[in-house]
């Protein structure tokens, strides 16, 4: 069988290679090297971590290409970068730069409130956020090769990531237990392609990996998300907004790998210093909830 560059098989295979690992947000080469040394399987290059984007307000855009290049030159692990929802040119620029993945991200200010990118038209694989199975399958239908929970980025509060992971997994179980003749109606309810629901029923799971993201701030948070069925973990502000980023990075990687070794997680957590300061989700207005962006 010939393998075509940019095909779903290749792009999904690249995402599978990150399974079980931690992907860390970084804003410069020094942070990227810390992440790689700690055992991160990939880094996300951006100008500001989500907590700083939230604090600054205004319009958040794709990172300056200089920052992305600096990170790409600093590490040997895959480098991801974020593009705004629906921003074709930002995505094409990142693809031309040679990033390993593009995150069509609700952390940035959406460029298009009606249309997401048609990710199947790109050679580079995409990761997208989701809150439920309908969102997940719409993004896969557009060509996403990897999913992540939206959570609530930049808050250090894991509750929304937990909600989204549990929601997706419970809906997957429901589909798996349906008879085939019920799937078309479920596709209508979810607003998702019938063919993807059929794949889920046949596979017994999503056809792509689904990582946890949005609110991971401690080793225990990372382990919890793995316990709930995540294929891996994204950590945004939780590393470099912590008191000791190097220790936090190493501890979160180990906790993700050994997520059911509770004695180890306790030891890892003993002398880390203070984690990032957290935000209570209920105090955020609807317009300040990044998870509401996209559909």
Curated annotation (Swiss-Prot):
D-glyceraldehyde 3-phosphate binds at residue 166. Pathway: Cofactor biosynthesis; pyridoxal 5'-phosphate biosynthesis. It catalyses: aldehydo-D-ribose 5-phosphate + D-glyceraldehyde 3-phosphate + L-glutamine = pyridoxal 5'-phosphate + L-glutamate + phosphate + 3 H2O + H(+). D-ribose 5-phosphate binds at residues 25, 154, 215, 236-237. GO terms for biological process: amino acid metabolic process; pyridoxal phosphate biosynthetic process; pyridoxine biosynthetic process. Keywords: Lyase, Pyridoxal phosphate, Schiff base. Catalyzes the formation of pyridoxal 5'-phosphate from ribose 5-phosphate (RBP), glyceraldehyde 3-phosphate (G3P) and ammonia. The ammonia is provided by the PdxT subunit. Can also use ribulose 5-phosphate and dihydroxyacetone phosphate as substrates, resulting from enzyme-catalyzed isomerization of RBP and G3P, respectively. This is Pyridoxal 5'-phosphate synthase subunit PdxS. It comes from Haemophilus ducreyi (strain 35000HP / ATCC 700724). The gene is pdxS.
């Amino acid at each position: 069988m010939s393998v075509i560059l940019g095909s779903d098989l290749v792009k999904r295979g690249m995402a599978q290679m990150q399974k079980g690992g931690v992907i860390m947000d970084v804003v410069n080469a020094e942070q990227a090297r810390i992440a790689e040394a700690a055992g991160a399987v990939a880094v996300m290059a951006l100008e500001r971590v989500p907590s700083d984007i939230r604090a600054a307000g205004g319009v958040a855009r794709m990172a300056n290409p200089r920052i992305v290049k600096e990170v790409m030159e600093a590490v040997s692990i895959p480098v991801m970068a974020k593009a705004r929802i629906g921003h074709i040119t930002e995505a094409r620029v990142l693809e031309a730069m040679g990033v390993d993945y593009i995150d069509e991200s609700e952390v940035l200010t959406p460029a298009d409130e009606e249309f997401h990118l048609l990710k199947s038209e790109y050679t580079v694989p995409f990761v997208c956020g989701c809150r439920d199975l309908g969102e997940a399958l719409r993004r896969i239908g557009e060509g996403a090769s990897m999913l992540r929970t939206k959570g609530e980025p930049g808050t250090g509060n894991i509750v929304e990531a937990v909600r989204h992971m549990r929601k997706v997994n419970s809906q997957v179980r429901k589909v798996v237990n349906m008879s085939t003749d019920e799937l078309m109606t479920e596709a209508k309810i979810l607003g998702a392609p019938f063919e993807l629901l059929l794949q889920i029923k046949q596979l017994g799971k999503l056809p792509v990996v689904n990582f946890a993201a949005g609110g991971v701030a401690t080793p225990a948070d990372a382990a919890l998300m793995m316990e709930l069925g995540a294929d891996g973990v994204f950590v945004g502000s939780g590393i470099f907004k912590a008191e000791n980023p190097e220790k936090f990075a190493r501890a979160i990687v180990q906790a993700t790998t050994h997520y059911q070794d509770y004695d180890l997680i306790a030891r890892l957590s003993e002398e880390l210093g203070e984690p990032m300061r957290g935000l209570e989700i209920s105090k955020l207005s609807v317009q300040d909830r990044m998870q509401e962006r996209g559909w």
